[in-house]
Amino acid sequence: MSIQAIESVLQLMQAQALQAASIAKPLPLQSGFASQLMAAVGKINQTRLNATKRAQDFTLGVPGVELNDVMVEMQKSSIALQIGVQAKNKLTASYQEIMNMQV
């Protein structure tokens, strides 16, 4: 391979890396209800992902992953989801109550 070909491949890789870095940038942190809600949903999703990963590790026979660890992670995920659903229900009921108030 010639030096020019290597340099062109290197430039292409650098351009792709810059493009990938610009796509992967997280949104700036915002304060307020919406950002708190997004953070809470993100935490619920993370517990689900952790439980799924632990179950896959157990299924594949990864050393150090026991059945009780999998069950605990699955219960944590289930409880987090139930809490999220209940919070959503309370927020929806509160919103409906506020919308029904007379001014």
From Swiss-Prot:
Gene Ontology annotations for the cellular component aspect, listed alphabetically: bacterial-type flagellum basal body
Main location: other
InterPro entries noted in UniProt: FliE (IPR001624)
Keyword Amino-acid biosynthesis: no
Subcellular location: Bacterial flagellum basal body
Keywords assigned by UniProt, alphabetized: Bacterial flagellum
GO biological process: bacterial-type flagellum-dependent cell motility
GO molecular function: cytoskeletal motor activity; structural molecule activity
Entry's family note: Belongs to the FliE family.
Annotated HAMAP family: FliE (MF_00724)
Protein name listed in UniProt: Flagellar hook-basal body complex protein FliE
Organismal lineage: Bacteria, Pseudomonadati, Pseudomonadota, Gammaproteobacteria, Enterobacterales
